[in-house]
Amino acid sequence: MVLETISRIIKIQLPAYLKKLPLPETIGGFARLTVSDWLRLLPLLGILALLGYLTIRPFLPKKKKQKDSLINLEIQKENPKVVNEIDIEDLNRTNVCYCRCWRSKTFPVCDKSHIKHNELTGDNVGPLILKKKIL
C-alpha cells in the first residue's frame, strides 16, 4: 500500500505537476511571469534551493569552536596551581592593576590584554584594581 502510493506520486502526480508548471523557454521569459505563475513555481524553487544547500553544506566553512575553553593558556603551566602573593603594604603607587584574564604578557600585572580577549570571545573580564588609600 505504501509503495503503491509512493509509486503513484513519482510516476503520475509528479510528472503532471511538472507539466503544469509555467517554465519559460528563455531566461527573459521569467520577467514576463505573473504573480500566480511565481506562486506555482514557489514549491519547486524551494525544494531546489534546499537540495542545493544540502549539497554545498559539507563544503562550507565550519564555525570555529572557542579554543579559549581553558582560562590559563600559557602562564606557569608547570605549576599545578598558579598563586601570586603581593604584599599590599608594599604598594608604591596609588593604583595597581592585576590581570584576571591570564593573557597578559606582564602577568600578574595587567597590560590590557583583556580588551582583545573580550572582543574575540565576547567575555567581559577586566583587571583587578588595587587602590592605596591615602589618609
Swiss-Prot record:
Source species taxonomy: Eukaryota, Metazoa, Chordata, Craniata, Vertebrata
Residues noted as binding [2Fe-2S] cluster in the record, renumbered to the chain: C99, C101, C110, H114
Any one GO CC term of the record: endoplasmic reticulum membrane
Alphabetically ordered keywords of this record: 2Fe-2S, Autophagy, Endoplasmic reticulum, Iron, Iron-sulfur, Membrane, Metal-binding, Mitochondrion, Mitochondrion outer membrane, Transmembrane, Transmembrane helix
UniProt key word Transmembrane: yes
Main location: endoplasmic reticulum
GO molecular function list: 2 iron, 2 sulfur cluster binding; metal ion binding; protein homodimerization activity
Disulfide bonds, paired cysteine numbers: none
Organism from which the protein derives: Oncorhynchus mykiss (Rainbow trout)
Name of the molecule in the record: CDGSH iron-sulfur domain-containing protein 2A
